[in-house]
Swiss-Prot record:
Listed GO CC annotations: cytosol
UniProt keyword list: ATP-binding, Cytoplasm, Glycolysis, Kinase, Nucleotide-binding, Transferase
Residues that bind ATP: K202, E319, G345, G346, D347, T348
Gene designation: pgk
Catalytic activity: (2R)-3-phosphoglycerate + ATP = (2R)-3-phospho-glyceroyl phosphate + ADP
Species annotation: Photobacterium profundum (strain SS9)
GO biological process: gluconeogenesis; glycolytic process
Protein name per UniProt: Phosphoglycerate kinase
Pathway it works in: Carbohydrate degradation; glycolysis; pyruvate from D-glyceraldehyde 3-phosphate: step 2/5
Cross-referenced PROSITE patterns: PGLYCERATE_KINASE
Length: 392
């Protein structure tokens, strides 16, 4: 997948009028007391749905929601709250179809939401018979859920292999374009920022990025392992002694600026006082929770000179006010940068919201696991399927 332009059919290039269009969206939103509590994913999918309706297509949209027992209907995981939301957002009569696998009737310009795909036996295993039933419902299959593109399931992969036409929806196409721009042929220097608690969970990401980034910035618990690799005491900080040698190797392969000063405390507590120390002064009972001001300034300078920025993970315990300065400084530098920036991952999005820089990031990825697997250089099954169908 790396180093080449992905060739897929785009929904925006197709004639949709009168066609039965099956959209696999990501409408996996939090629901409380029958109401959608965070509508970000629905909002992201609305332009695709509207475009199909305005073109006069017969529109079906579906998604998973939560983790119900497969093959069993469970009202707690119904897409009914999403249907209610769409009724208001689109100002039209949106129906919910529970039993649709043997066919469904709808008119041009009409929208039907097909109930949670995980209520169908065989969804997760990419069952061939189920995939063919989905495919029989439509003339055009639209894959628009980047967040599930790394899973080969019946509604993300199998249906596309069997549908008459399989294409990428606008949301997915934009995502692939932005990630491709950041990783396949980036304007340089490319600066990658990887935060998080453990090197082990991000090891393949770090190894992959060390090969393409001009500077690889590490933060959070990951940074502590690199500080230890430079021979410094990290006290009681979260770090992985067994990966110190791996960190040393990564530092040989790529420019990784390691913190020179850090914010420490004696306990993991929101009200703990942040004490700024040079890395050589960290004591046995200290815990490192953030970058110090000097290190943050150095990284901000590196980011300001970048032409491409890839951000995944905060650089400190930004949820605590006393340990948010490092992540806030990184966020501000990205916001002020004139380079092309892509950010992804749950904690990263929370940091973007907290520091109010959403409008200043060039592209915010909607996929957690899919974003990481793309960055690792892995082939995403749904994307591979779209590429294969584009050749046919």
């Amino acid at each position: 997948m790396r180093g080449r332009t992905m060739s897929v059919i785009k929904m925006t290039d197709l004639e949709l009028a009168g066609k039965r269009v099956f959209i696999r969206a990501d409408l996996n939103v939090p629901v409380k007391d029958g109401k959608v509590t965070s509508d970000a994913r629905i909002l992201a999918s609305l332009p695709t749905i509207k475009r199909c309706l305005e073109a006069g297509a017969k529109v079906m949209v579906t998604s998973h929601l939560g983790r119900p027992t497969e093959g069993e209907y469970n009202e707690e995981f119904s897409l009914a709250p999403v249907v209610n939301y769409l009724n208001d957002a689109l100002d039209c009569d949106v129906k919910l179809a529970k039993d649709y696998l043997d066919g469904i009737e709808l008119n041009a310009g009409e929208l039907v939401v097909l109930e949670n795909v995980r209520f169908n036996k065989g969804e997760k295993k990419n069952d061939e018979a189920l995939s063919k039933k989905y495919a029989a419902l439509c003339d055009i299959f639209v894959m628009d859920a980047f967040g599930t593109a790394h899973r080969a399931q019946a509604s993300t992969h199998g249906v596309g292999m069997n549908a008459a036409i399989a294409c990428a929806g606008p949301l997915l196409a934009n995502e692939l374009e932005a990630l491709g721009k950041a990783m396949d042929n980036p304007a340089r220097p490319l600066v990658a920022i990887v935060g998080g608690s453990k090197v082990s969970t991000k090891l393949t990401v770090l190894e992959s990025l060390s090969k393409i980034a001009d500077q690889l910035v590490v933060g959070g618990g990951i940074a502590n392992t690199f500080i230890a690799a430079e021979g410094h005491n990290v006290g009681k900080s979260l770090y992985e002694a067994d990966l110190v040698e791996t960190a040393k190797k990564l530092m040989k392969d790529c420019a990784i600026p390691v913190a020179t000063d850090v914010a420490c405390a004696k306990a993991f507590d929101e009200n703990a006082e942040a004490v700024i120390k040079h890395v050589s002064e960290v004591q046995d009972d200290d815990m490192i929770f953030d970058l110090g001001p000097d290190s943050t300034a150095v990284l901000a300078e590196i980011i300001s000179n970048a032409k491409t920025i890839l951000w995944n993970g905060p650089v400190g315990v930004f949820e605590f006010k006393n340990f948010e300065a490092g992540t806030a400084g990184i966020a501000k530098a990205i916001a002020d940068s004139e380079g092309f920036s892509v950010a992804g991952g749950g904690d990263t999005l929370a940091a973007i919201d907290k520091f109010g820089i959403k409008a200043d990031v060039s592209y915010i990825s909607t996929g957690g696991g899919a974003f990481l697997e793309f960055v690792e250089g892995k082939v995403l099954p749904a994307v591979a399927m779209l590429e294969e169908r584009a050749k046919a």
